[in-house]
């Protein structure tokens, strides 16, 4: 399944969750798009709830189904709770951590920064958004890219960096000090439903 590249606001309304992280998509119209508007939402079956939760998380991180399932399977081989491990692996993606650092206003914009070669890990350029960052590694912006308008604008509006990142705004770099804990990850996601979906 290909990565969704359509309007993010429309997908946010369909899934009932803000994919941009701003919440603006749902402020005026907190219902699915289309002619039926607010009357379109209906009670979902157990399978429908599981599928919806899976789609919410997959689109939140901007992944293809193949990437998403592969990460899910990898999480299943780790000790501990499958669902929590899955969330932790998703959070460790390079594009996501660039977003968490505040270098981009959305994960989609962060993915573009990585794709275009603006981001470095431990001093080496990495242009793979799905690159899994390990604790202790440092993420930074290339010197040639430090004056990008999109980066400066993003930093100006960002007022929160999670505790598992130590961010130096002057150097535009952060160290991924540890894996995130479940309490620090999206509370609106019920990962147990996703485990149930793939366990059918």
UniProtKB/Swiss-Prot annotation:
Q: Which SMART domains does the record cross-reference, listed alphabetically?
A: Ribosomal_S4, S4
- Region called Disordered, residue ranges: 22-42
User: Superkingdom of this entry's organism?
Assistant: Bacteria
> Which PROSITE patterns does the entry mention?
RIBOSOMAL_S4, S4
Q: Name one GO molecular function term.
A: structural constituent of ribosome
What CDD domains does the entry give? S4
GO terms under biological process: ribosomal small subunit biogenesis; translation
Instruction: Report one GO cellular component.
Output: small ribosomal subunit
What are the S4 RNA-binding domain coordinates in residue numbering? 92-155
Which keywords appear in this protein's UniProt record, sorted alphabetically? Answer: Ribonucleoprotein, Ribosomal protein, RNA-binding, rRNA-binding
The UniProt similarity line reads: Belongs to the universal ribosomal protein uS4 family.
Q: How does it assemble?
A: Part of the 30S ribosomal subunit. Contacts protein S5. The interaction surface between S4 and S5 is involved in control of translational fidelity.
Role, per record: One of the primary rRNA binding proteins, it binds directly to 16S rRNA where it nucleates assembly of the body of the 30S subunit.
Protein's name in the database? Small ribosomal subunit protein uS4
Which organism encodes this protein? Bacillus cereus (strain AH187)
What gene does this protein come from? rpsD
């Amino acid at each position: 399944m290909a990565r969704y590249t359509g309007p993010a606001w429309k997908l946010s309304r369909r899934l009932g969750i803000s994919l941009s992280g701003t919440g603006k998509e749902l402020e005026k119209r907190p219902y699915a798009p289309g002619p039926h508007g607010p009357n379109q939402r209906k009670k979902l079956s157990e399978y429908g709830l599981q599928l919806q939760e899976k789609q919410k998380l997959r689109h939140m991180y901007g992944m293809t189904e193949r990437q998403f399932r592969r990460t899910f399977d990898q999480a299943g081989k780790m000790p501990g709770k499958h669902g929590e491990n899955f969330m932790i692996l998703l959070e460790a993606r390079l594009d996501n951590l660039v977003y968490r650092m505040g270098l981009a206003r959305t994960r989609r914009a962060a993915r573009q920064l990585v794709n275009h070669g603006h981001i470095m890990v431990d001093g080496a350029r990495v242009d793979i958004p799905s690159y899994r960052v390990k604790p202790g590694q440092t993420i930074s912006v290339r010197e040639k890219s430090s004056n990008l308008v999109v980066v400066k604008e993003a930093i100006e509006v960002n007022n929160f960096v999670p505790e598992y990142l130590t961010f130096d705004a002057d150097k535009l770099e952060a160290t991924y000090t540890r894996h995130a804990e479940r309490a620090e990850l999206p509370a609106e996601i019920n990962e147990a439903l996703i485990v149930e979906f793939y366990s059918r």
